[in-house]
Amino acid sequence: MLENKLGITDSAELARIEEKISKQKAVEMFENGYLESLEAGTYESLAMIHKYLFDEIYDFAGEIRKVNISKVNFRFAPLMYLDAALQSIDKMPQSTFDEIVEKYVEMNVAHPFREGNGRSTRIWLDLMLKKEIGYVVDWSKVDKEDYLLAMERSPIKDIEIKFLLKNALTDNVNDREIYMKGIDHSYYYEGYYVYKTEEL
């Protein structure tokens, strides 16, 4: 159970409130042009996305985590190497689809935040794709289990995640419906599906 600004002590309630507020913020940053104002592909822009999404809920929004974290069979970058990893990721090229996905995979391994990494990093990925090559991922075309498996394997073999994402690319980069559905699917991958973004 994470400490939060709202004083919520029930984990199920926190999950619901976190989903609702951060989805509202995701819509807001799309509609008010905030996303467009960010530089694509930097840790700083990812931290700003994370802070925008979660600042009403967590004190650590936009801040580098202070603990080591892992998920099931996956250990993320150890704390002692995290700063160096983020500096290295910032320097990675991002001019082609393959380079952008490779950068995304490395940022996922870094997992710089205590919570909310996947949701903020997928928005960050789309910002890179949009600004660099004129595409975004239509996440509604990316199966949850296929995606999670591909991401789990991606540090060793990234061909699967590249294949999945390439097949879901669209040049409708400013389409509100694609963005809204994308947020819903992105949250669904993490187990959040109480609210539909378009209804908030």
Residue spans for each PLM region:
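FIC/Doc superfamily catalytic core
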Residues: 1-200
